[in-house]
């Protein structure tokens, strides 16, 4: 029997823009209330909140879903805990958790831009060379935040003995590789392994886990980053955020999924990525071949002429 998001309650991080905003719209249109956790909201996200106002005196329902926002830095564990508490206070229960916020190895947290130091004073990196412990922001956001939010979600569901759905935003980068963004690829490889590892929860305690794995998608993740946007044309990015949102809804509502499923999504359709001996993805379909070619040229020039400064 098909599942339904109608009348459910969700947390979506990164819902202020891009894929996660498109998915937030999709959930609301299907009668699912959403609490968005993000650093900020794009104008279209602010308009969405106005369309689905929250009246604390009236519980949300399938006929009257609500949209709320809590400013959240997902790299902060206390802020993730506060986001979860806010959802518990606003909703009767939490049914769906989507750790969707992510960054695509920006110049300020990149393997090829090591942290600023006495011997590397001009680095654009915001990562701290003297951090105790040391860490990279791209891993904090892309990998550690979904793991921590998953702990909070599973604690909510198991303490109440209720079912739940954990839907993580992965990437085709979780099973391919590229020299230009090794931290990003590492984060998505780790994320897919994490999701698969939780797969037994579905048949043990009725907690469904899955990841969507898009190729390049026409979102601010590309367009707002000058290091990315000048290496790929909008014509090559065939998939829209709405395409991916449709596939994410399928992951939630199709009962055959949820046991650690990794669902690849491109403009041409979807496929379940098997855990072993998976056929390679079509990089052209994924829309990243032009980007990889451009970033490889940049990397080769930098590493051969300048080396790596730390």
Regions from the language model: what does each represent?
Residues 42-44, 71-85:
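The beta1-alpha1 cofactor-binding region of Rossmann-like NAD(H)/NADP(H)-dependent oxidoreductases
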Residues 89, 102, 137-161, 199-200:
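Amphipathic alpha-helical dimer-interface segment in Rossmann-like NAD(P)H-dependent oxidoreductases
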Residues 211, 228-286, 290-310:
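C-terminal helical subdomain
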Residues 171:
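Residue(s) in the substrate-gating loop at a strand-loop-helix junction
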Residues 2-35:
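Canonical Rossmann dinucleotide-binding motif of NAD(H)/NADP(H)-dependent dehydrogenases/reductases
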Residues 30-47:
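Conserved glycine-rich Rossmann-like NAD(P)H-binding loop of the short-chain dehydrogenase/reductase
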Residues 114-150, 167, 191:
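Catalytic Tyr-X3-Lys loop
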Residues 30, 156-160, 176, 197-208, ...:
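Active-site-adjacent segment of SDR/Rossmann-fold oxidoreductases
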């Amino acid at each position: 029997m098909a599942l339904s998001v109608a009348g459910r309650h969700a947390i979506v991080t990164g819902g202020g823009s891009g894929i996660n905003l498109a998915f937030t719209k999709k959930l609301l249109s299907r009668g699912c209330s959403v609490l968005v956790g993000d650093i900020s909201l794009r104008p279209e996200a602010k308009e969405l909140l106005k369309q689905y106002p929250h009246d604390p005196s009236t519980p949300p329902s399938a006929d009257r879903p609500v949209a709320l926002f809590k400013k959240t830095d997902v790299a902060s564990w206390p802020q993730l805990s506060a986001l979860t508490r806010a959802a518990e206070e606003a909703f009767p229960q939490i049914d769906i958790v989507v750790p969707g916020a992510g960054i695509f190895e920006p110049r300020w947290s990149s393997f090829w831009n090591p942290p600023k130091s006495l011997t590397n004073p001009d680095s654009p990196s915001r990562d701290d060379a003297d951090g105790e412990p040391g860490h990279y922001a791209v891993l904090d956001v892309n990998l550690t935040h979904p793991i921590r939010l998953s702990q909070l979600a599973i604690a909510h569901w198991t303490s109440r003995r209720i079912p739940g759905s954990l839907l993580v935003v992965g990437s085709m980068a979780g099973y391919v590789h590229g020299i230009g963004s090794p931290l990003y690829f590492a984060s998505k490889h780790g994320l897919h392994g994490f999701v698969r590892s939780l797969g037994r929860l579905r048949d043990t305690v009725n907690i469904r886990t899955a990841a969507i794995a898009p190729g390049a998608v026409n979102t601010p993740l590309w367009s707002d980053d000058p290091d990315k946007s000048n290496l790929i044309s909008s014509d090559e990015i065939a998939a829209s955020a709405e395409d991916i949102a449709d596939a994410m809804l399928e992951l939630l509502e199709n009962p055959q999924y949820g046991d650690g499923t990794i669902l690849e999504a491109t403009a041409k359709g979807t496929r379940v990525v098997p855990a072993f001996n998976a056929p390679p993805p079509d990089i052209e379909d994924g829309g990243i071949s032009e980007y990889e070619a451009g970033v490889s040229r940049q990397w080769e020039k930098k590493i051969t002429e300048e080396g790596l400064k730390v």
